[in-house]
């Protein structure tokens, strides 16, 4: 659930914003 890979971040900004 994220534009890139923000599944572990909780929102949409993942580890590779």
From Swiss-Prot:
Tissue expression as described in the entry: Expressed in abdominal perisympathetic organs and abdominal ganglia.
Modified residues (Leucine amide): 17
A cellular component annotation (GO) from this entry: extracellular region
Subcellular location as annotated: Secreted
InterPro entries per UniProt: Pyrokinin_CS (IPR001484)
Keywords: Amidation, Neuropeptide, Secreted
Major location (coarse): secreted
GO biological process: neuropeptide signaling pathway
GO molecular function, one term: neuropeptide hormone activity
Highest taxon in the source lineage: Eukaryota
Biological function: Myoactive.
Similarity field: Belongs to the pyrokinin family.
Protein name in the entry: Pyrokinin-5
């Amino acid at each position: 659930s994220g534009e890139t890979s923000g599944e572990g971040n909780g929102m949409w900004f993942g580890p590779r914003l």
